[in-house]
Amino acid sequence: MIRLENVSYNYPDGTPALRNINIGIKKGEYIGITGKNGSGKSTLALHLNGLLRPQKGKVLVRGMDTGDFSKLQGIRKLVGIVFQNPETQFVGRTVEEDLAFGPENLCLPPIEIRKRVDRALAEIGLGKYRYRSPKTLSGGQGQCVALAGILTMEPDCLIFDEVTSMLDPDSGKAVLERVKRLHEKGKTIVYITHNLEELQAADRIIVMDRGKIVLEGTPENVLSDLSLRYLGLTPPSLIELAERLKNHGVAVPWEKTSSPSSFAEEICRLFLKT
């Protein structure tokens, strides 16, 4: 669905942000992109729907080049971005007006706009706040409104750029659960975060450092890679526990579907066997 070919991009001061990036993202895939601050992951996100355009190489979305200005509207119908701070995306006085903004710019009929707004409100479970100002909502609710505003555009691909970094743990989990449900419904997901705990549901993880891709693979392979700490990243707590147990002669297998409860059950099972 999206292909990056030898993409490079420098900051205005000349510092490289992306260096010769090559990525292919398939329709329906769940991609996690991670790296410490300054690794280039957010700059990469802005390239995926043409908010930034490469200085070298190209980004293709369903064959459309983001460098072709005439294709940008079509590209942005297909690829939507939810940012770290939802308030940067609010344009309406009420939640309902905010959600209607995108479809109105697509010149859709009022009946279709109403259907999309109602559907998006039902998806995020915030129908009772439709007449509230989005700026009066909690951080988690505001992030869900920003997501709903993108959903009214009905994109095939959703990019989430550090969307939980300003949320409390419970709100963050709620947003992650909605991302998971969207993927189950067939949406292509690109989820960007420095928190590796949030990437266990991904099909594939890409690790960036200084504008380059330095690791890529399944969650099982990437999240257990010993080089993560040298890249300034902290492995998920379950993987760290599994590694410590392994060092003491207890091999507990970890999978992307592992939860704290299932992991604890496996440990108990192993000890009961002995």
UniProtKB/Swiss-Prot annotation:
GO molecular function: ATP binding; ATP hydrolysis activity; ATPase-coupled transmembrane transporter activity
Entry keywords, A to Z: ATP-binding, Cell membrane, Membrane, Nucleotide-binding, Translocase, Transport
Cellular component, GO annotation: ATP-binding cassette (ABC) transporter complex
InterPro entries per UniProt: AAA+_ATPase, ABC_transporter-like_ATP-bd, ABC_transpr_CbiO/EcfA_su, ECF_ABC_transporter_ATP-bd, EcfA_1, P-loop_NTPase
Entry-linked PROSITE patterns: ABC_TRANSPORTER_2, CBIO
UniProt enzyme class: translocase
Binding, ATP: G35, K36, N37, G38, S39, G40, K41, S42
Entry's EC annotation: 7.-.-.-
Membrane topology type: Peripheral membrane protein
Pfam families: ABC_tran (PF00005)
Subcellular location: Cell membrane
Domain ABC transporter span(s) in chain numbering: 2-235
Subunit architecture: Forms a stable energy-coupling factor (ECF) transporter complex composed of 2 membrane-embedded substrate-binding proteins (S component), 2 ATP-binding proteins (A component) and 2 transmembrane proteins (T component).
PANTHER family (alphabetical): ENERGY-COUPLING FACTOR TRANSPORTER ATP-BINDING PROTEIN ECFA1 (PTHR43553:SF24), HEAVY METAL TRANSPORTER (PTHR43553)
Purpose of the protein: ATP-binding (A) component of a common energy-coupling factor (ECF) ABC-transporter complex. Unlike classic ABC transporters this ECF transporter provides the energy necessary to transport a number of different substrates.
Family listed: Belongs to the ABC transporter superfamily. Energy-coupling factor EcfA family.
Protein name: Energy-coupling factor transporter ATP-binding protein EcfA
Organism, scientific name: Methanosarcina acetivorans (strain ATCC 35395 / DSM 2834 / JCM 12185 / C2A)
Gene name tied to this protein: ecfA
